[in-house]
UniProtKB/Swiss-Prot annotation:
Residues 135-146 have a biased composition (Basic and acidic residues). GO terms for biological process: apoptotic process; cell differentiation; Wnt signaling pathway. GO terms for cellular component: nucleus. It comes from the Eukaryota. This is BCL7-like protein.
Length: 146
């Protein structure tokens, strides 16, 4: 009798797991995905990520804000993309290319932490063969001996 109860419990667990899998799979089939520019927490890094379309975006029509005159000082150009409300998704400033390297700077300032220089480097390195350290080894040996 004890073993019958165990098999009965296992059967109900498996059945509930199967039902849960069916529900999840049916939701995944109808879920819509879109690629959005997402700001990573605690950084200024923005990456494209596939995110599910929220029900609010599907149901609510996009809010169109009144187009104002663009000042010369303004960095943002009013458009349908910039007027949509988004909590975790941000649009990049228009002066930056989306595919640019994050270490690239368009400013005329010099990064003091950078080890790069603007002067040409006259490196005359040759990869003609293996490096010979025998002269350095001989000099070391003679300096160690009194």
């Amino acid at each position: 009798m004890y073993s019958a109860n165990r098999s009965h419990r296992a059967e109900t667990r498996n059945r509930s797991k199967d039902e849960l899998r069916k529900v999840i799979n049916s939701l995944e089939k109808v879920r819509r995905w879109e690629k959005k520019l997402v700001l990573i927490k605690d950084t200024n890094i923005r990456i494209y990520k596939w995110v599910p379309v929220s029900a609010q975006n599907i149901m609510a029509p996009p809010k169109i804000k009144e187009v104002k005159e663009v000042d010369e000082e303004s960095n943002q150009v009013p458009s349908a993309e910039n007027s949509q409300d988004s909590t975790s998704v941000t649009q990049p400033p228009p002066q930056f290319d989306i595919n640019e390297d994050s270490n690239f700077s368009t400013g005329d300032h010099f990064d003091s932490d950078s080890n790069q220089t603007f002067e040409p480097q006259n490196y005359q390195g040759g990869a003609t063969g293996s490096t010979d350290f025998s002269s350095m080894r001989d000099a070391e040996m003679t300096s160690k001996q009194p």
